[in-house]
Curated annotation (Swiss-Prot):
GO terms for cellular component: cytosol. One of its GO terms (biological process) is response to hydroperoxide. Pfam families: H2O2_YaaD (PF03883). It comes from the Bacteria. InterPro entries: YaaA (IPR005583). This is UPF0246 protein YaaA. The lineage of its organism: Bacteria, Pseudomonadati, Pseudomonadota, Gammaproteobacteria, Enterobacterales. Belongs to the UPF0246 family.
Length: 257
């Protein structure tokens, strides 16, 4: 099974590292082309494009300017330890054992606007470039057109090398749109997390994001390799709801706390 998750806007380049092992991203040639593109933007243009404050725009203009393709532990950090959003709060990779990192490196992939597809131990330099932004580039009007089939092809290559045919989609809609399901040589399974609010079960963004991380951790810690094993997921009060689930959409619910 190959797990797909989204990246995070919040980054951490300060905390102690849980591992010193690292690999290099596999799509850096494409990242370099995007960097060349965004370096042509002024900080005010970045602010408008990304809908962020002037301060954040200045920071990211500096990041784009400082970015260089020779990644070392001195100027970069492993992706799984650099991202720090709600998904990564659930994942808690900073507590992984060496064996957990091994399994994650094989079975977990992070989608990224700048890097395309990252393995957990791939080094990355700090950036902000969300997949959904409309960044004009030589390949089209946005990042979906820029990446085209590249991410899907890389996923197919990974699946083939592992003799695998199952992808667990724990990514957001914005990021999963960079994958072409019809061209993916795999069965796609999407876990959905519903929380009870005022007697009704619905997707609550913060909880759902964290649950995607919890599910990723559950798969990694328990070395799960078959989709039917996912139904045992019970972290932080979630339970599998067979009645509302389908073969390709597994529904997990949690009662109001």
């Amino acid at each position: 099974m190959l797990i797909l998750i989204s990246p995070a806007k919040t980054l951490d380049y300060q905390s102690p590292l849980a591992t010193t092992r690292y690999t290099q991203p596999e799509l850096l040639d494409h990242s370099q082309q995007l960097i060349h593109q965004v370096r042509q933007l002024s900080a005010p243009q970045i602010a408008r494009l990304m809908g962020i404050s002037d301060k954040l725009a200045d920071l990211n203009a500096t990041r784009f300017h400082d970015w260089q393709p020779h990644f070392t532990p001195d100027n970069a950090r492993q992706a799984i330890l650099a991202f720090k959003g709600d998904v990564y709060t659930g994942l808690q990779a900073e507590t992984f054992s060496d064996a957990d990192f091994d399994f994650a490196q094989q079975h977990l992939r992070m989608l990224s606007g700048l890097y395309g597809l990252l393995r957990p131990l791939d080094l990355m330099q700090p950036y902000r470039l969300e997949m959904g932004i409309r960044l004009e580039n030589p390949r089209g009007k946005d990042l979906y057109q820029f990446w085209g089939d590249i991410i899907t092809d890389k996923l197919n290559e990974t699946l083939a090398s592992q003799g695998d045919r199952v992808v667990i989609n724990l990514a957001s809609e914005e990021y999963f749109k960079s994958v072409k399901p019809k061209k993916l040589n795999a069965e796609l399974i999407k876990p959905v997390f519903l929380d009870e609010k005022n007697g009704k079960f619905k997707v609550i963004s913060f909880y759902a994001k964290k649950a995607r991380g919890l599910m990723s951790r559950f798969i990694i810690e328990n070395r799960l390799t078959k989709p039917e094993q996912l139904t045992a997921f019970n972290s932080e009060g979630y339970f599998f709801d067979e009645e509302t689930s389908t073969q390709d959409e597994l529904v997990f619910k949690r009662y109001e706390q």
